Amino acid sequence: MSFRDLRNFTEMMRALGYPRLISMENFRSPNFPLVAEILIWLVKRYEPQMEIPSDVDTESDRVFFIKAVAQFMATKAHVKLNLKRLYQADGYAVKEMLKITSILYNAMKTKENAGGDQNNDENSKFKFDLGSKIADLKLARQLGSEITAKGAALFDLLGQEEDLRESRTAAIARPLEITETERAMRAAVKDVTESIQMTKDLLNNVSSDEASLEAKIEKKKQDLERNQKRLQTLQSVRPAFMDEYEKIEEDLEKQYQTYVEKYRNLSFLEQQLDDYHRVEQERFEEAEMAMKMRQNKLKEEEKRLMRSGVARDEDSDVDIPEDEGSDSDIDDGQQARPHHPRHTQISGRGGARFIGSMRGGDSEETEDSEIDVDDDDEDDDEDGEEDEEENEDLDEDNDSLEGSSGKPGRTNQSLHPQILEESDNDF
């Protein structure tokens, strides 16, 4: 494609009156929709009544469109187009479309030049209109194609004249026989008579068929009217069983209402039962969980008490050897200082006698309380009561000792601090 061809094409299309502005950049790349639009417009310029499919969405539609345009131009304008270049829709397609536009543009220029030579004023008043001459151009193209076809047929027939001349001459020179001619004429007349009789029979059959069809139609109409009247009668008359039917229908409706109500109640009760089971299950699970928690708590408390009991046993085991050791020391030192064992009688000035011991670790109540604590660690209240009893006994012993300390003489006063000192060490 050259720049000159593209420029000439755009100028010719503008001169022919193409409504769209064509740029030189439109054909740098394939643009099939624009090429299809231009080809349709050019075909309409040749023949406005020509119908060409404008669907070019698919590949097959485009091929069919290009073939239709090329065939039209070949038969009407005697212009041979390259289908491959038209399908490319680029600069090479412009060369093919330039063939069509050149014919139209030259015809327009020739008409303008002829009109300008005759009368420039008339040309200025009446503009050249190619559209008004399209019908004449169409008729001329059609006549030209018919003349060409008939001329070709005539040429073929004239070519067969040499072969048919001898047969025609022999047929003309042969004398006609009356018998054969009469026989042929009678055969022809007989054939014509048979065909006429057959046609009459067909006409008679048609008339009879028409009469039978009319009779059938009339019969059907009568049946239809009779059935309509019967239908109206049946609709107007109330059946004898209608009362019973209505009564049964009412009973059935009541039964259905009762069924629906009972079904709803049953559904509601089932739902309530399910809710109750669910609540009971939740309560059971909560109770089981609480029981497990209490069991775990009791186990932990038991473990804690066992640990505390073991600790107290260890403490008591540690304290007992110390007491034994202290007792042994006291036994060893009995010769050095006097010692008053349990239940000893201390004489005073007034002759009062006190029975008891100042050693808290040697009391029976203290031993019993220690045994109770070691054996039953779970009962904290009992331990507290025993501790209170121990404290009360110790207080009573101390009070009794204090009462006796004021009455005895110096000898007793000298011994009393030793006993208190030993008891303090024992505690």
UniProtKB/Swiss-Prot annotation:
List all Basic and acidic residues biased stretches: 300-313
Deleted gene: phenotype: Mutant animals develop ventrally curved bodies visible at the end of 1 dpf, followed by bilateral kidney cysts in the glomerular-tubular region detectable at 2 dpf. Cilia in the anterior pronephric ducts are already visibly defective at 1 dpf and by 5 dpf, cilia are completely absent from these ducts. On the other hand, cilia from the posterior pronephric ducts remain unaffected. Cilia biogenesis is also defective in the retina, with the outer segments of photoreceptor cells having modified cilia. No visible cilia in the lateral line organ. Pericardial edema is also observed at 5 dpf.
The chain's disulfide connectivity reads none
InterPro entries hit by this protein: Clusterin-associated_protein-1
A GO BP term here is: kidney development
User: Which portions of the sequence form the region Disordered?
Assistant: 300-427
- Which cellular component, as a GO term, is one annotated location? microtubule organizing center
Give the UniProt keywords, A-Z: Cell projection, Cilium, Cilium biogenesis/degradation, Coiled coil, Nucleus
Q: Where is the composition biased (Acidic residues)?
A: 314-332, 363-400
Localization in the cell: Nucleus; Cell projection, Cilium
Query: Which Pfam families does the record associate with it?
Result: Cluap1
Q: Does the keyword Nucleus apply?
A: yes
* Coiled-coil boundaries: 202-307
User: In which broad location class does this protein mainly occur, judging by the first location in its UniProt entry?
Assistant: nucleus
Q: What biological function has been recorded for the protein in this entry? A: Required for cilia biogenesis and maintenance in the kidney, the lateral line organ and eye. Appears to function within the multiple intraflagellar transport complex B (IFT-B).
Name the family.
Answer: Belongs to the CLUAP1 family.
Q: What is this protein identified as? A: Clusterin-associated protein 1 homolog
